Each structure stands twice: as structure tokens, then as C-alpha cells.
Amino acid sequence: MRRTVLALAFTALAAAAPVLAQAPEPRIVIVHAGQLLDRPGRPARGASTVVIRDGRVVEVRDGHVAAAAAGFAGAEVVDLRNRYVLPGLVDSHVHLTSDTGGVLSQLEEVQLSPAAKAYNALGNARKTLGAGFTTVRNLGDRDGITLALRDAVRAGKVVGPNIVDAGTSISTTAGHMDAALGFRDDLREALDRHDNLCDGPDACRRTVRLQVARGVDLIKIATTGGVNSRIGAGLGQQMFDDEARAIVETARLYGKKVAVHAHGADGVKLALRAGVDSIEHGTVLDEECIALFVKTGAWYVPTLSTVNGYLERIAADPNAYSPAVRAKVDWRIKVTGESLVKAVPRGVKVAFGTDAGISKHGRNADEFELMVKYGMTPSQALVAATVSAAELLGLSAEAGTLEPGKRADLIAVTGDPLRDVTVLKRVSFVMKDGVVFRDVRGP
């Protein structure tokens, strides 16, 4: 009897197997765009239809094609016929665990638990996505928080922008990434394990390998001091040539790009000669720096909107910064944009990045206005935040344009961003991977 029951059960399962094996119906979404900037750098292509299957663009057609006429009767239709539609934006320099710097954030760094910082990071990620930035490159935090957030987003456990993450940034002892700067010697080990600090080529090779072992997507280093470094050591070179070369060579062994925090020209030149992929901030660029950018093909990420964060923090609390840091803040505000004015006409490759965490998360698009103020056309600024930033991140096959095969990450605005980049501050619609995240278009 038992054998008979088992036989019947196996027969029933076998009969059901084809049904169980059937793939789910594809999810089709059709977007009708009033004006489509599918490939920034080119003119808008006018009224268009974007066909999306399971989160990927499969087709772009001229005109507003009905779902049935497109061969997808019953598909979801998103009506953006009164909007400019363009690819999701890319911010290539954010710090999702951080908020505007100052005395408070210094205290929070040692008071907040990693769990509390993780919730902050998730909230900041959602603000960023809501602002139309569907991809970000996170350039430094501690405790592996953004690495975990990156993985959670990729697995679909939480909603946020796609994240490319550098883990913990590397510098020398007493360099910009030394988290215990400004604290007593006896507190240094209690505050941080300092495994992101290296002195000498061999130590720097090991430090890179530690970051790779933790699963980072790229390496971030500092070759100069930083504005928010809690010492008055200036913004010049703080790493030797052989240390920078050792870092780049080791990163290359593992197929990792290298992004470099550098303000002073000496640190910029050191990094470019070492073969890095991008310079972040690049506040002072002399003629030799610009020639090296052109020669090496490295990217320049100017992070102009940090000045907004500084100005807002000072307005809220004139004593937010120590005298040593305030002097650097005032200098950064004074010279911001001067290097971009020189770099753009010379053909230096520029990618969009804000340093959000110094400036406010969710206001990433403020950078566009400053890029235009300091020498870029609206079209160039938009390319920097789409095609160019995607290339810098190694994601040209996934992001930056709306073409068949790429992720269906798109945004919509009222008004032409090629005439007025400030419309990008008011994104009314955000879709990531074919799923609507934000829709405030009204009736």
C-alpha cells in the first residue's frame, strides 16, 4: 500500500513539474516621454516610447506607441508626455554614513553605534535616490556599513541607489583618513583600529589587500591633507611617491581602480604620476596638473558643492569648526571653481561628484548649478553626471544612457535641463530597475 501511495505521489509531482518549471510572466512597462534625453550629449529625440522588460530597457521608439501596438497588450503604461525624461543620475563621490561635518559629527563618530550609523546610511541612500541619483560611488566610511548596504540593495532587501563602494579610505598616519586626529594619544587605539593607515610601501600594499579582502569595489586614498582634518597641517602632500605607487600597483593586481582625495597641486601630481583613475576635489590645479590629466586620461571630480555644506554649517553655528579647520574651510570657499574653469577648456575629463555628507544628501543636484557657473555648459554637466560618471565607475554597460540592455533607471523633470540645469533640483519622477520609487507629478 505504501509503495502505491508513493508511486501515485511521484506521478502527481511529475505531472506538475512542467507547470512548476514555467517561468513567470515578464513584467513589461512602457514609458511615454514628452522629450527623451536617452543619450546625454546628444539633442533630445522628442516624443518617445521606452519599452522595459524585467527592469531592463529592451527598446526605444520614436513617438508614443500604444502598448498593444508595441506588442505588449496589458503592459503597465507610465505617462510622462509632459516631462523631459533622462537616465538616472550618477554621483561619483558620496559618503552615505556621514552628515555635514563639524564638532557635532566629530562627537557622533565616537558616540553613535555602527547600527545607528547604518540606519543613517539607509536614510541618506533613500534621500539620494529620491533626488534622481540611481547610482552612487561611496568613497569612505568605517565599520563596513556601506559595503553591507551595497549588498542589501543588490539583493533587493532594501531600496536604494546602486552603490559602488570603496570601504575605508587609506592614508598615512596623521593623514586625512586618520580617524583619531585631534584626540589624546591614550585614546587612539580605543577610537579606531587604524588598519587603513600605512607608512612605507610594504605597509601600504598590505593595507590595500585588507580592503580587497573585505570586498571593496575600488580603493580610495588621500595624498594630501583635508579640509575637515582635525589638525592645521595644511592641504599639501602627505604621502610619498613610493607609497602611492605601491597602492596603485597592488590595486591593479586585484583589478581595482583608485580614487584619490587631493587638494594641493603637489598631491595631485604625485597621484597622477602613480597612475590613479580619478582625482577628487583637485582644488588647486596648475598647468602641470592639467597636462598630466590630459596625458593620463584620469578623471577630475571637483566636488564643488562642499562649499554649500560649509556655508550652511557656519550660518547655523559660527563655532562649528576649530580655528585650524575654519582657516581651511574659508580658503576652500574662496578658491572653489577656479581649477574647473582652467580644466574644462583643456579637455580634462570631468565626472560629477558632490562629496555629499559634507553637503547635504538629497541635494546632490546643487552641483549642476556650480559646474555651469564655473565653465561647463548644461549639456557638459549632464554628461558628467551620466555618461562620464558611469564610465568612471566602470558601469557604462549598465548606466549612463537609456539603451537596450541597460538598467531601466530613469528620471523625469519639468523643463529642459539643457537650458536650465536647476530643473534637476526638482525631480518629480524616479524609476530604478523598472520600478517607480518617486512620483510627485500631481494630477
Residue positions per predicted region:
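Active-site gating loops and adjacent loop-to-helix segments of metal-dependent hydrolytic enzymes
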Residues: 97-117, 173-193, 227-240, 296-333
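Alpha-helix-loop-beta-strand connector modules within alpha/beta enzyme cores
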Residues: 151-169, 235-260, 301-305
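Metal-associated gating/positioning segment near the N- to mid-region
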Residues: 83-157, 173-178, 242, 266, ...
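Histidine/acidic-residue-rich catalytic or RNA/ligand-binding cores of hydrolases
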Residues: 100-104, 146, 175-176, 229-231, ...
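Histidine-rich, glycine-flanked metal-binding segment
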Residues: 23-27, 36, 40-86
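His/Asp/Glu-enriched, well-ordered alpha-helical/loop segment
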Residues: 109, 253, 257, 321-324, ...
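Bacterial N-terminal signal peptides
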Residues: 7-16
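Divalent metal-dependent hydrolysis catalytic cores, especially in the metallo-beta-lactamase
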Residues: 120-146, 160-169, 216-229, 257, ...
